[in-house]
C-alpha cells in the first residue's frame, strides 16, 4: 500500500530517472507507432481495455515498445502484474511466482499477469515450467522477444498464446517522441 512517504519517494526518484524511463508511455494512447497492434478496434487494445487479456507473445525489434506495452498493461489491469527477466530468472523463480499466482487466484479470484522479458533466452526447461500455468490460466503470460517466437519459443506456449508483431518506428514516430520529450513536463519541458 502506498503511503504519503512512498508517493514522495517515488516523486523524488522520478526526478533523477533517465529520460526514457520518465517518458515511458502510461496509456495505450501514449504508445507511438503501433496502431496495427494496439490501435482502435484491435483485439489487443480491446482485451486490455476490458481487462480480459489472454496470453500473448510480443515480438519485434529492440525499441519498438514491447516492454512499454507490458507496463501499460500493468497500469491498465486489475490483475497483479509480475515481471521476470529471462536473463536472470530461474525455474525456481518461475515456480515461486506461479505458486503465488495460484494462491491469489484461489483465495481472492485475482488474476496474475506474468511478464517475461526476453522470453527467448529461457531454455526449453524454463519455458516448459510455464506451460501448466498458462494452460490452466493460473497466469496470463505476456512474453517479449526480439527473436522470431516460432523458432525460439516453445511451440506449446505459442499454441496457447497470441503472437503480436510490433514494427520498427518510422522517422515520423521518432520525431513525435522527441517533440514529446522536449515539451512534456515528465521530460525536458518540466525542467
Label the model's feature ranges:
Residues 29, 56, 164:
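Conserved beta-strand position immediately N-terminal to the Walker
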Residues 45-49, 116, 120-159:
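Conserved catalytic/switch belt of AAA+ P-loop NTPases
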Residues 60-61, 82-90, 145-146, 166:
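A short hydrophobic beta-strand->loop->alpha-helix junction that borders the nucleotide-binding pocket
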Residues 2-12, 46-84, 99-102, 131-136:
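Walker A/P-loop
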Residues 1-50:
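A short, basic N-terminal segment
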Residues 37-42, 79-113, 124:
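Short glycine-rich substrate-engagement loop in P-loop NTPases that contacts/grips substrate
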Residues 170-191:
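Conserved small helical "lid"/interfacial subdomain of P-loop NTPases
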Residues 85-87, 162-175:
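Conserved AAA+ ATPase "SRH/arginine-finger" region at the nucleotide-binding site
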Amino acid at each position: 500500500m502506498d503511503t504519503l512517504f512512498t508517493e514522495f519517494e517515488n516523486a523524488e526518484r522520478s526526478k533523477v530517472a533517465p529520460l526514457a524511463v520518465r517518458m515511458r508511455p502510461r496509456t495505450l494512447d501514449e504508445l507511438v507507432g503501433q496502431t496495427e497492434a494496439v490501435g482502435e478496434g484491435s483485439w489487443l487494445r480491446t482485451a486490455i481495455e476490458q481487462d480480459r487479456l489472454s496470453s500473448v507473445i510480443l515480438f519485434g525489434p529492440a525499441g519498438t515498445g514491447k516492454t512499454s506495452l507490458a507496463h501499460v498493461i500493468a497500469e491498465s489491469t486489475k490483475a497483479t502484474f509480475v515481471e521476470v527477466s529471462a536473463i536472470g530468472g530461474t525455474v525456481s523463480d518461475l515456480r515461486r511466482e506461479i505458486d503465488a499466482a495460484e494462491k491469489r487466484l484461489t483465495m481472492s479470484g485475482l488474476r496474475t499477469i506474468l511478464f517475461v522479458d526476453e522470453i527467448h533466452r529461457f531454455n526449453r526447461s524454463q519455458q516448459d515450467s510455464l506451460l501448466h500455468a498458462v494452460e490452466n490460466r493460473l497466469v496470463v503470460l505476456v512474453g517479449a522477444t526480439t527473436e522470431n517466437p516460432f523458432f525460439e519459443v516453445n511451440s506449446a506456449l505459442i499454441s496457447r498464446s497470441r503472437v503480436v508483431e510490433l514494427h520498427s518506428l518510422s522517422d515520423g514516430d521518432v520525431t513525435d517522441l522527441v517533440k514529446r520529450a522536449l515539451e512534456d513536463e515528465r521530460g525536458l519541458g518540466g525542467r
